[in-house]
Amino acid sequence: MKLAEALLQRSDAQRRVDQLRDRVTANARYQEGEEPTEDAGELLAQAVETLATLESLVVRINLTNARTTLPGGDTMTAALARRETLRATHALLVTASDAARGASGGYRQLRSELRMFSALPVAELRDRADVVARELRELDVEIQKTNWEAELQN
């Protein structure tokens, strides 16, 4: 199985656990004289079984990420950490740029009101955000490509 397929299965398992949790909660109690819509015990057993499958998948995915290298020589684990850092950096730069340009609505209605000035270079921040966004897209393409090429480890 390819790493990408395992990632899809992990996502499906996580979604299934969430759905089962909701169904268990909805059927954990019922009113006297009525029957629950579903057997909460059976739903709970299914959720526990799905969690065991999920745990096995996560272990194999993490092993694969640690052992798989991207074309640039970094491990998948390092590339994933880099991607998260790039995402956080991009969000920070965009937020700072928006705040510096007054995107939150700091305008003057009267000439007697105080003028607001930007403490940060908006154009430079936007340029840096664009560069980071490009790096992020390129790295994400490498990661996705490798996900479909790498075999899932045991």
Roles of regions detected by a PLM:
Residues 1-154:
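Structural preference for solvent-exposed beta-strand-turn elements
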